[in-house]
Amino acid sequence: MIAISRQTADLSGYPDLIVIYLAMKAHSLRGFWALLKIGPAIKKAVNAQPDGLLHHEENIVYSLFPPHFGMRQYWRDFDSLEKWTREMPHMGWWKDLLARPQGVSFWHETYSIRGGIESVFLASRDFDSRPGLLAFAPDVDAKGSMFSARRRLQLQGEGRPPVVSE
């Protein structure tokens, strides 16, 4: 008989741990090319080891037809994640996606060890099936108190200014 080993992660050294899932879904050939373009750029950015990024996992396949791919990241704390999102190259990707969606939908879901969960879905009404939290929870516009991830997580402090204004 094979002995089974059972472990768990000791997260006591990570009191502010953040886990974020990110994904894009192509709705057109142009969207497929956008997916192919962003992959190497993300790999280059995470290989630069941004401060606070503990681990990056890619190649989560939600579907092949239509292409819907994602990744998961572990961050030391929300401030580190927020700082990275307000700098290049992430800031440029976000501005570009908001200005020119290029036939893709994007979503992310953020989970805090302290208990908060937040999400944002761009062009989610174009999804054939509603991903993640939208599969069971109603959607609301990301405005006002729901505009930034910091606000959606109900974290204290001003944080960094958003990449785009409301």
List the predicted regions and their residue ranges.
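Short S/T/G/P-rich N-terminal loop/turn motif that feeds into the first structured element of a domain
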Residues: M1-H68, K83, F106-E166
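An amphipathic, aromatic/His-enriched active-site/gating alpha helix that lines ligand/cofactor pockets
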Residues: F78-H108
